Amino acid sequence: AQCGAQGGGATCPGGLCCSQWGWCGSTPKYCGAGCQSNCR
């Protein structure tokens, strides 16, 4: 699912991180630099 700026401000289900590219995931690639929501 898309999230963040690319997804109309949507957040990710299940507490997943929103990457700088606007996609949901749980790895540092998503949760690290540039993360848009649910960041760790």
Swiss-Prot record:
Disulfide bonds join C3-C18, C12-C24, C17-C31, C35-C39. Keywords: Antibiotic, Antimicrobial, Chitin-binding, Disulfide bond, Fungicide, Plant defense. Not glycosylated. InterPro entries: Chitin-bd_1, Chitin-binding_1_CS, Endochitinase-like_sf. Residues 1-40 form the Chitin-binding type-1 domain. The keyword Disulfide bond applies. GO terms for molecular function: chitin binding. Pfam families: Chitin_bind_1 (PF00187). It comes from the Eukaryota. One of its GO terms (biological process) is defense response to bacterium. Antimicrobial peptide active against plant pathogenic fungi and Gram-negative and -positive bacteria. This is Antimicrobial peptide 2. The lineage of its organism: Eukaryota, Viridiplantae, Streptophyta, Embryophyta, Tracheophyta.
